[in-house]
From Swiss-Prot:
This is Cell adhesion molecule 3. Belongs to the nectin family. It is a single-pass type I membrane protein. GO terms for molecular function: protein homodimerization activity. Gene3D superfamilies: Immunoglobulins. The lineage of its organism: Eukaryota, Metazoa, Chordata, Craniata, Vertebrata. It comes from Homo sapiens (Human). GO terms for biological process: heterophilic cell-cell adhesion via plasma membrane cell adhesion molecules; homophilic cell adhesion via plasma membrane adhesion molecules. The gene is CADM3. The record marks 25 as: Not glycosylated. Residues 367-398 are annotated as: Disordered.
Amino acid sequence: MGAPAASLLLLLLLFACCWAPGGANLSQDDSQPWTSDETVVAGGTVVLKCQVKDHEDSSLQWSNPAQQTLYFGEKRALRDNRIQLVTSTPHELSISISNVALADEGEYTCSIFTMPVRTAKSLVTVLGIPQKPIITGYKSSLREKDTATLNCQSSGSKPAARLTWRKGDQELHGEPTRIQEDPNGKTFTVSSSVTFQVTREDDGASIVCSVNHESLKGADRSTSQRIEVLYTPTAMIRPDPPHPREGQKLLLHCEGRGNPVPQQYLWEKEGSVPPLKMTQESALIFPFLNKSDSGTYGCTATSNMGSYKAYYTLNVNDPSPVPSSSSTYHAIIGGIVAFIVFLLLIMLIFLGHYLIRHKGTYLTHEAKGSDDAPDADTAIINAEGGQSGGDDKKEYFI
């Protein structure tokens, strides 16, 4: 049993040595070139890069899927102005192909002519750009609650694109995208349909079909179809002024909405047999409101889609106690006048107080300026003495 166990252990050691990273490095071929696969949008530019670690004094070469040599080192081999040299060194050969077409798709080969010849493949994938989608199926305006079916189609995509629907910001769930190969055998035509019931809110809405494809790189490519929906009218009555009072002029506006817009309006008052005649377009006019005008009024708005009747209850209030504008102006003017009079009174009071305080000085100066100045001085002294000396009054002549 010892010999078989030893043999098994030896085999495991050999297997580990062969698959160890060190063993892999020992078997690496430094003269083997390497490349990478590339994806390019039709009409774009692709760069093919080939590199080698040990060139063994040999040049790198690029050839197309038809095995036509494009570049050998820095030397152009195929006369195609779309193909240009990017880098040429002993360790790298890079070329670019501009204005790439679907026919350029395939495997490109990088070769190095050592012994033996070594090659590396680069798969170039060309994306076909989908055309702007086309919406069909909408012929004329729809009636409310009708069912609409729209079709969308886009061709030229590779790989096949995907179509989505939306109405405004709302996503519509259409049928799965149908795929059909184009006659060129390389691109595809995709189509989808959507069916939905229309409402009055859909009037004027845009139904959008968008194509999603990696070649667009997030750019929007869509088509919209605006739809028109016919629906029965609605109406509401708006009073002007909002709170009518007795003696005022009142207009009751009947505001109709619909598609088409109502063109005929008929006014009635409950309890009154004949239709009301005092109208202006869609408004009912009351030149001078009376209490007898109170009641419930109806407005019937009519279009070729039907009719709608709105009601309004009118309660005529007593005349407004609010003063007229002229009375308001008079009150303002009266207030200004009263304020001015008040200021004048204040000024007169201050002026009188000032004159009383300075009356003695004024009389003294006036007396000194007259011919009886000595007598005036005597009088002043007597007056001062009378205040300080009690009942004894003496005269002094200056």
